[in-house]
């Protein structure tokens, strides 16, 4: 098979033809016909409600494109859920707890003697908080550098080009914009009959700031967030039980990878109760009691814990914005309906990130934000949602991009599979961290890579070679014929690619 040249491939994914819908075309032309604000005008070209990953990135990009921009953020700190009470603080705790676990259980294998290792939880939480503060200040600095106006307060629509803002200092102001982008993110999804008090019954926010390590922790929900936070407190000494209504953990994950991942977590003493329904939660006593039953019905049982983490997903934050007053259409879940240029049914009103359909991921929201303001500026923007990577930041990590084997079977696509275990990777063996594998799915006829799934200590970093390859329609042979430095973990991706179209060398 001749090697395909990535450099010669047409990067068709960077552009997109305008929709054939007359309604969409009308909205787009109306939007552009508004023109851009002059430097002396009090009207903005772009107003963004929400300063999370989608909102703040959109604001900076809009300003870089020459658009007068204002960003409104109710929290008083930029970065949204991700930076303040999500991605960043959780990764800080995941890293700190992993260091503690390594010191306690792995240092001896490397000839390092430690007499005693203790958790200083206040110091650990302080390190997490400092990381958050430094990063939020960093975004404020980027706003100043790019001349983005920052308004701290809660914004609501008055009209399609006016937002009333109740500022955090108690004042009120009106912000006008030719184009308004809703980037308000998402909130914790509640469960019927369960009241989150952020003390004994906590959301992911409360789980980031527990005052002590609970002896027993029950996690409701076996998704990304639940497994990550369960890992944090499990490493620090909690007995962790995960209760999940579905029959699998992380249902969107490739089935083969998911099974190995669950076995890995079980080795770390994380317990799973799958196909289990939470009937009620009682926190009136010192601890918390959960009444559960089989998902299909049956005999009930009682589970006891010191803390219960409710991690049953997230819901778009669109209530309280007065969207209905200006006629913006939403679906039953509260997501704003937009076209392929992020424009709602109301001319001049756009939406990005968690408030529109698609994966609720910070990096997806960032891409939405860039593409949206590019459209507003009269340029081409594009986000391919089939090629957005996902990562579970446990240890080992699990990262994926593209299709799973189950999806390809359902779609009737003929494919080949190539796998390579890290047990056969020299760098992984050298650092005594060889759990996991790389799995590549490629089209049987063309060898085009359709999906890549990695379980490894640093899978979240390794996946991006695959993301680039998939975006450029690379074949498995393309990756296999690229020289990879030795010894590196990334050689496992090369070997898996070799296994996909031919044979690997080291197994």
Curated annotation (Swiss-Prot):
SUPFAM superfamilies: FAD/NAD(P)-binding domain, FAD/NAD-linked reductases, dimerisation (C-terminal) domain
Entry comment describing in which tissues the protein is expressed: Preferentially expressed in leaves, flowers and siliques and at a lower level in roots and stems.
Binding of FAD, residues: 73-82, 91, 155, 184-186, 354, 360-363
Cofactor requirements of the protein: FAD
Free-text comment on the cofactor: Binds 1 FAD per subunit.
The EC number(s) this enzyme carries: 1.8.1.4
Record: active site: 486 (proton acceptor)
Residue range of the transit peptide in the UniProt record, numbered on this chain: 1-36
Annotated Pfam families: Pyr_redox_2, Pyr_redox_dim
Superkingdom assignment: Eukaryota
Alphabetic keyword roster: Disulfide bond, FAD, Flavoprotein, Mitochondrion, NAD, Oxidoreductase, Redox-active center, Transit peptide
Cellular component terms per the entry's GO annotation: apoplast; mitochondrial matrix; mitochondrion; nucleus
Example of a GO MF term: ATP binding
First-level EC class: oxidoreductase
Cysteines paired by S-S bonds: 82-87
PTM comment text: S-nytrosylated at unknown positions.
Reaction catalysed by this enzyme: N(6)-[(R)-dihydrolipoyl]-L-lysyl-[protein] + NAD(+) = N(6)-[(R)-lipoyl]-L-lysyl-[protein] + NADH + H(+)
Keyword ATP-binding assigned: no
Induction section of the entry: Up-regulated by light.
GO-annotated biological processes: response to cadmium ion
Binding site for NAD(+): 221-228, 244, 278, 313
Assembly description: Homodimer. Part of both the glycine cleavage system composed of four proteins: P, T, L and H and of the pyruvate dehydrogenase complex containing multiple copies of three enzymatic components: pyruvate dehydrogenase (E1), dihydrolipoamide acetyltransferase (E2) and lipoamide dehydrogenase (E3).
The family this protein is said to belong to: Belongs to the class-I pyridine nucleotide-disulfide oxidoreductase family.
Other known facts: The active site is a redox-active disulfide bond.
PANTHER family: DIHYDROLIPOYL DEHYDROGENASE 1, MITOCHONDRIAL (PTHR22912:SF223), DISULFIDE OXIDOREDUCTASE (PTHR22912)
Protein name, as recorded: Dihydrolipoyl dehydrogenase 1, mitochondrial
